């Protein structure tokens, strides 16, 4: 299950720090109303600040943070948990804070879930401790007050460290909510109700720390869900290989072609606890997926991967890091070509930048305000301050937020390399954001942590003025306020190829017959109302693993009541049309062509829809497509 290693690496970002803050020689210019120090307000330990225009009217932006109140630093448990919303002048917005039922390990996200034109805030809570049973996802209206809806996550442990990603999966024009849980499931909830969408949740066999990315990989205008998970033999119930898995699902919950992909096997626990980033890193006009591994002390646990959307590795990847990469990569154009570069931190406090071919641009250890090497650094973000200045990187360095140029050298907010400006807070920083809070064309750097080093009782929200606004390729955790983790590909022409399939005839071969209880893998008893049975065709009757669809003759007989039969790819949802219909007492046959599942296992699902009674089903295969 790899929870111990996962829990430790999660704490590294914000808690495994011994250095206390040292103030920069040149004071950073505070934005009016900041820093905002809230006595008894708690500290932001794991989440990153959300910067968003909640009113969705083009006006000033708000800052949203989840905080843990803990007056006893020797006990990591929170005494109180709160969700805050601050305006651009540092005032707590009317209707806030709101109480949370457990600690917010995840970061808040925002989108218009109900279609009223104003955004809602979504956050996940709960930890990895078995028996706690405190995992939950909550949605709040921008005005505050009681939650719009809550979704208690079943099982134990059931915490949600996975930051929810918001996007329209069911095609109704409103965003839905996607996240993973420590209960080994990935969920997609209807944005308006908080109830699971058809085809979800999906069991991914081990704990999920990774935050999902949402991106159109197929080029068909629909979002796919991309997420990492732990994957280890210890205690796993089914079909698990040691190494960690990168999963990609279609909006209906079925597997996307070419996935899951697994990390290299290792005698130790590996796992994808990094949150994937999606964008065009090789300049081919199509999105790639970038994600890091974590936990294992072997080389397999210190890799940064990049996959094409068909599941093949991008040339030059994976690359080896000096430590585990549990953070999310950030993507941005650091040079003049069309491809995005990749920036990531590891748990040895190094910051890396790579080109799309895997070549390293730099590897640096940022320094604190006092000039000491960083011990631990948080999530990177990428922005451009000033029309003529290079893209810069902003990362949490202990108590500080530091700025580096595209070559990894320190840089001040005016673009000079001599200033080496570092912003200092009163507590460890998990990550920063860059935004134009006021809408006046000037950027601010935003961080949230605590107000003093020795206390976890007092909240500190910090905002510094940082110069004229430029491009913002990756300005906050997981790229945007919906936390989709993707830089959209523009220009089109990226639909997945659909090569012609060739048909191969087979002598009729019986695969399933519910009248028999012996001699066939898929025998009796008869089907009962609503029953689904999964049939594997790969390796049966000469069907190869490369088959994409099959031609089958389906016969029903001994029907005691009228009904219909539905046949569909394994992993897909049940279709609205039937393959065959019948009346009581009839025997009927029909030939149909059905795609096989994209899971690489050649599955079909047979579902009997009848109001009562039973029916026998016979399946004969007579050909396949590949």
Predicted regions: what they are:
Residues 24-493, 565:
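Extracytoplasmic/lumenal domain signature
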Residues 493-626:
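Short edge beta-strands and adjacent beta->alpha junctions
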Residues 9-21:
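Bacterial N-terminal signal peptides
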Residues 1-7:
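N-terminal secretory signal peptides that target proteins for export/translocation
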């Amino acid at each position: 299950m790899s929870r111990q290693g996962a829990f430790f690496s999660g704490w590294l970002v914000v808690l495994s720090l011994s250095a206390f803050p040292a103030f920069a020689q040149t004071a950073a210019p505070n934005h009016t109303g900041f820093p905002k120090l809230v006595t008894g307000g708690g500290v932001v330990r794991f989440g990153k600040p959300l910067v968003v225009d909640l009113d969705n009217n083009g006006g000033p932006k708000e800052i949203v943070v989840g905080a843990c109140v803990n007056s006893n630093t020797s006990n990591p448990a929170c005494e109180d948990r709160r969700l805050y919303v601050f305006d651009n002048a540092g005032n707590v917005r009317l209707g806030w804070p709101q109480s949370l039922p457990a600690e917010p390990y995840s970061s808040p996200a925002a989108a218009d879930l109900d279609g009223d034109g104003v955004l809602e805030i979504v956050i996940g809570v709960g930890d990895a401790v078995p028996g706690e049973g405190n995992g939950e996802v909550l949605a709040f209206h921008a005005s505050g007050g009681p939650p719009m809806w809550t979704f208690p996550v079943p099982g134990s442990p059931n915490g949600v460290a996975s930051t929810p990603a918001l996007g329209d999966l069911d095609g109704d024009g409103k965003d839905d909510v996607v996240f993973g849980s420590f209960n080994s499931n990935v969920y997609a909830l209807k944005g308006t109700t908080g109830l699971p969408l058809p085809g979800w949740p999906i069991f991914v066999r081990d704990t999920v720390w990774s935050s999902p990315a949402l991106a159109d990989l197929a080029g068909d205008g629909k979002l796919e869900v991309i997420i990492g998970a732990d994957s280890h033999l210890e205690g796993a119930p089914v079909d698990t290989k040691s190494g960690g898995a990168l999963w990609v699902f279609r909006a209906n919950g079925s597997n996307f072609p070419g996935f899951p992909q697994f990390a290299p096997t290792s005698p130790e626990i590996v796992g994808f606890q990094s949150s994937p980033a999606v964008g065009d890193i090789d300049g081919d006009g199509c999105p790639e997926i970038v994600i890091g591994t974590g936990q294992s002390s072997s080389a397999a646990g210190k890799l940064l991967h990049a996959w094409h959307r068909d599941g093949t590795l991008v040339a030059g990847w994976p690359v080896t890091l000096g430590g585990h990469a549990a953070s999310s990569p950030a993507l941005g154009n650091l040079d003049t070509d069309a491809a995005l570069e990749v920036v990531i931190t590891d748990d040895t406090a190094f910051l890396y930048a790579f080109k799309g071919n895997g070549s390293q641009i730099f590897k640096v250890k940022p320094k604190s305000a006092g000039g000491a090497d960083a011990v631990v650094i948080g999530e990177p973000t990428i922005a451009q301050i000033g029309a003529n200045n290079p893209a810069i990187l902003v990362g949490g360095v202990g108590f500080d937020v530091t700025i580096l140029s595209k070559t990894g050298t320190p840089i001040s907010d005016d673009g000079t390399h001599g200033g080496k400006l570092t912003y200092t807070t009163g507590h460890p920083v998990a990550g920063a954001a860059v935004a134009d809070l006021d809408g006046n064309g000037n950027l601010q750097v935003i961080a949230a942590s605590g107000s003093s080093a020795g206390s976890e009782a007092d909240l500190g929200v910090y905002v510094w003025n940082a110069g004229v606004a430029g491009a913002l390729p990756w300005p906050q955790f997981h790229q945007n306020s919906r936390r989709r983790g993707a830089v959209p590909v523009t220009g089109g022409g990226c639909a997945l190829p659909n090569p012609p399939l060739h048909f191969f005839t087979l002598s009729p071969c019986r695969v399933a017959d519910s009248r028999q209880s012996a001699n066939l893998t898929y025998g009796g008893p008869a089907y009962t109302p609503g029953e689904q049975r999964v049939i594997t065709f790969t390796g049966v009757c000469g069907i190869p693993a490369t088959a994409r669809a099959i031609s089958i003759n389906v016969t029903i007989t001994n029907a005691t009541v009228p009904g219909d039969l539905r046949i569909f790819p394994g992993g897909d949802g049940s279709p609205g049309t039937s393959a065959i219909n019948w009346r009581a007492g009839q025997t009927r046959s029909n030939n149909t062509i059905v795609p096989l599942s994209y899971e690489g296992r050649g599955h079909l699902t047979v579902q009997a829809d009848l109001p009562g009674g039973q029916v026998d089903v016979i399946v004969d295969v007579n050909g396949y497509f590949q």
